[in-house]
Amino acid sequence: MKMKRLALLLTVCLAFFGCKQKPVDGAQLLKILNDENLSLVVSNHDSISRHASPRVDDLMRILTTEPERLKGAVVADKKVGNAAASLLALGGVSEVHTNYATHSGKRILEQAGVKLVYAREGDFIFNNDSTGQCPMDSTLNGIADHNEGFARLQEKFYNK
């Protein structure tokens, strides 16, 4: 708790005196994500935001309420499949670091010109029961347009 307060105090002091924080690279963001058991870390506009919601909930919220937060951002995401990759591409991030990327997620980010750094790559992300593909990713199978993908996810999972 003391470390969080100290970090906050340092950030406030730096902002007050017009100093900028030293840019954080993607490897550092991934370390933060893993060390703090988060699902998403976003670095942009001289600030870092930490998120711990399941699935792509935080990406959907950011795209809906503050899309400028992702434009040009460096992001660490726990797993990147179709859904996360499409949302990250739609948001205009510049770089993504992840522990695991699917082949299709990797392809989506490459086509969008997003730099991707990953530890492992595989066919798909499993659903919660480990019996098949993640339902969010399967919702976007065959959808190339990121706006359409966002709308489908919104309709199927978030408009209830």
Task: Identify what each model region corresponds to.
Residues M1-K2:
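N-terminal secretory signal peptides that target proteins for export/translocation
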Residues P23-N99, E121-G122, F126-T139:
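Conserved mixed alpha/beta catalytic, RNA-binding, or beta-rich assembly cores of soluble enzyme
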Residues T102:
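Conserved SAM/SAH-binding beta-strand->alpha-helix loop
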Residues K106-K160:
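C-terminal binding/interaction regions
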